[in-house]
Swiss-Prot record:
Belongs to the LysR transcriptional regulatory family. Negatively regulates the transcription of the flagellar master operon flhDC by binding to the upstream region of the operon. Residues 18-37 bind DNA. The expression of the hdfR gene is negatively regulated by H-NS. GO terms for molecular function: DNA binding; DNA-binding transcription factor activity. Signal peptide: none annotated. Gene3D superfamilies: Periplasmic binding protein-like II (3.40.190.10), Winged helix-like DNA-binding domain superfamily/Winged helix DNA-binding domain (1.10.10.10). It holds the Pfam family HTH_1. This is HTH-type transcriptional regulator HdfR. The gene is hdfR. It comes from Escherichia coli (strain K12). InterPro entries: LTTR, LysR_subst-bd, Tscrpt_reg_HTH_HdfR, Tscrpt_reg_HTH_LysR, WH-like_DNA-bd_sf, WH_DNA-bd_sf. One of its GO terms (biological process) is regulation of DNA-templated transcription. Residues 1-58 form the HTH lysR-type domain. Keywords: DNA-binding, Repressor, Transcription, Transcription regulation.
Length: 279
């Protein structure tokens, strides 16, 4: 039996709501419904009664519940034990492409330069969207997440690493926002909430990407502008701030599981500055 089906069943039974279960599992509501139907088909019974928003366990669902909890608990314990033996020298760090390109690449270099303190440690630099990385962290498939948003789950520990400055850049001097096409570089959902006010409510991005390198290479060809970290843009050269734009300060957080068996290691690694300029 697919353990993901049992995991979904347990979440729906806990929340009594397909939408909230989908949010907790980082799935769509239709995916949650499909998984429950799959499990019901495998067992040949209905597990929930559905009357509008009132979702309840059937008698069969009530009987399955303790077995599902035991199976998932056993499975998680097995995964943890196997991971502990096979990954004791591995350490995975996840972040978006833009964060790796603009600042974390340099930090990774500093980690290797300080390897005397952690001899034999093997790093994995993982690139993905924040939502996917949060899920991996929750499932113990990732050791550390670096992101611009504070955690929203109680089981996570976090540390504010500092702040960095974003500015709107283009490839030629003395340009105004109205003269340029907008390239959206993803800096997190909370940044996008303010994006319309910073750019213009009617501005439709000509390109959306999670890669700062790609955005920087395209702005000249597309007569565009995009938000880039100031320290990174200065090192790149050939970039100019848009005249009628402002700057924006963004936080950077390290996030990990509170009960991670690598807590001490994580705190040691975070003693090495992640940002070149911390303020």
């Amino acid at each position: 039996m697919d353990t993901e089906l049992l995991k979904t069943f347990l979440e729906v039974s806990r929340t009594r709501h397909f939408g909230r279960a989908a949010e907790s599992l980082y799935l769509t509501q239709s995916a949650v419904s499909f998984r429950i139907r799959q499990l019901e088909n495998q067992l040949g019974v209905n597990l929930f009664t559905r009357h509008r928003n009132n979702i309840r366990l059937t008698a069969a669902g009530e009987k399955l519940l303790p077995y599902a909890e035991t199976l998932m608990s056993t499975w998680q314990a097995a995964r943890k034990e196997v991971a502990h033996t096979s990954r004791h020298n591995e350490f995975s760090i996840g972040a978006s492409a833009s964060l790796w390109e603009c600042m974390l690449n340099q930090w990774l270099g500093r980690l290797y330069q300080n390897q005397d303190a952690h001899t034999g440690l093997q790093f994995e630099a993982r690139i993905a969207q924040r939502q996917s990385l949060v899920k991996q962290l929750h499932e113990r498939q990732l050791d550390l997440l670096i992101t611009t948003e504070a955690p929203k789950m109680d089981e996570f520990s976090s540390q504010l690493l500092g702040y960095f400055t974003l500015a709107l850049y283009t490839s030629a001097p003395s340009k105004l926002k109205g003269d340029l096409n907008y390239l959206r570089l993803e800096w997190g959902p909370d940044f996008q909430q303010h994006e319309a006010g910073l750019i213009g409510a009617d501005e439709v991005p000509i390109l959306t990407t999670s890669s700062a390198e790609l955005a920087q290479q395209q702005i000249a060809m597309l007569n565009g502008c995009t938000w880039l970290p100031v320290s990174w843009a200065r090192k790149k050269g050939g970039l100019h701030t848009v005249v009628d734009s402002t700057t924006l300060s963004r936080p950077l957080y390290a996030i990990w599981l509170q009960n991670s068996d690598k807590n001490a290691l994580i705190r040691d690694l975070l003693k090495i500055n992640v940002l070149d300029e911390v303020y």
